Amino acid sequence: MVKVAVTGALGRMGSGIIQKILETEGLNVVAAIDIPNHPKKGHDIGELIGIGKLGVNLSTSDELESVLKSSGAEVLVDFTAPAPCVNTAKIASKCGVNLVIGTTGFTKEQKDEMEKAIFENKVAATISQNYAVGVNIFFKTLELLAQKLGEYDIEIVEMHHKFKKDAPSGTALRAAEIIQENLNRNSNLIYGREGITGERTKEEICIHALRGGDVVGDHTVIFANDGERLELSHKASSRQSFIAGVILAIKFVGTKKEGIFNTFDVLGLN
């Protein structure tokens, strides 16, 4: 039985992950954590998310170290925000707790700081911009398309709900990274266009970020050439696609002693 702690426990992803863990054989929720001074601190997390009493009370991140130690958590799942996630990763690593990180929007410095803590404390972590199985097949397909259609004009379009705080999405940025890694030419990443931009250069890869409504996550990469256009799309209709991948990552990282992994490792795509 893998003992799991979840931060951002009352968020959209956190509450969904808790519910899915409880439905999954071999996994158990032992701690649920949210922001400091949360008014619901001490209340049963199951009752707070509407699934009935679980016997696990909501804790807050300012007491994370003691909660991890007292609960015996083996894996911590974090879908929060960059700054608190870095702090959480440092504390969890110090406590010998493995990590599943789905937070996006890190600066290079934040990511380096987090990875340093993971390596220094010799724990295991999966870090991914998107845990959906379909998205990772999308990523794998992009490798081939970039290799074969590298001379085409490439544009990336993503759309998310109006509450998303970072732009472009981590998934769109990862798609751009994969394309750049597999192109046989120089490339230049830009974000949207405005004004008199002049003709499009061959080196441009442009990301367009759209926000509105309750869109869970749409991503399309366009390869355009004279006379034809190829579009590769992934559209998420619910967060269950992400949550299913998180469960696979929890099981995967629960068997590892140390190292940083991604969803290609989890799914055997490397």
UniProtKB/Swiss-Prot annotation:
Coiled coil: none
Ligand binding ((S)-2,3,4,5-tetrahydrodipicolinate): H161, G170, T171
Enzyme Commission numbers on file: 1.17.1.8
Highest taxon in the source lineage: Archaea
Gene3D superfamilies the record matches: Dihydrodipicolinate Reductase, domain 2, NAD(P)-binding Rossmann-like Domain
PROSITE patterns the UniProt entry points to: DAPB (PS01298)
GO molecular function: 4-hydroxy-tetrahydrodipicolinate reductase; NAD binding; NADP binding; oxidoreductase activity, acting on CH or CH2 groups, NAD or NADP as acceptor
SUPFAM superfamilies named in the record: Glyceraldehyde-3-phosphate dehydrogenase-like, C-terminal domain (SSF55347), NAD(P)-binding Rossmann-fold domains (SSF51735)
Subcellular location: Cytoplasm
Record field: catalytic activity: (S)-2,3,4,5-tetrahydrodipicolinate + NAD(+) + H2O = (2S,4S)-4-hydroxy-2,3,4,5-tetrahydrodipicolinate + NADH + H(+); (S)-2,3,4,5-tetrahydrodipicolinate + NADP(+) + H2O = (2S,4S)-4-hydroxy-2,3,4,5-tetrahydrodipicolinate + NADPH + H(+)
InterPro entries assigned to the protein according to its UniProt record, in alphabetical order: DapB_C, DapB_N, DapB_N_CS, DHDPR_bac, NAD(P)-bd_dom_sf
Pathways involved: Amino-acid biosynthesis; L-lysine biosynthesis via DAP pathway; (S)-tetrahydrodipicolinate from L-aspartate: step 4/4
Residues noted as binding NAD(+) in the record, renumbered to the chain: G8, A9, L10, G11, R12, M13, D34, G102, T103, T104, S128, Q129, N130, Y131
Active site: H160, K164
NCBIfam families reported for this sequence: dapB (TIGR00036)
Function recorded in the entry: Catalyzes the conversion of 4-hydroxy-tetrahydrodipicolinate (HTPA) to tetrahydrodipicolinate.
Family according to the record: Belongs to the DapB family.
Protein name: 4-hydroxy-tetrahydrodipicolinate reductase
Originating organism: Methanococcus vannielii (strain ATCC 35089 / DSM 1224 / JCM 13029 / OCM 148 / SB)
Chain's gene name: dapB
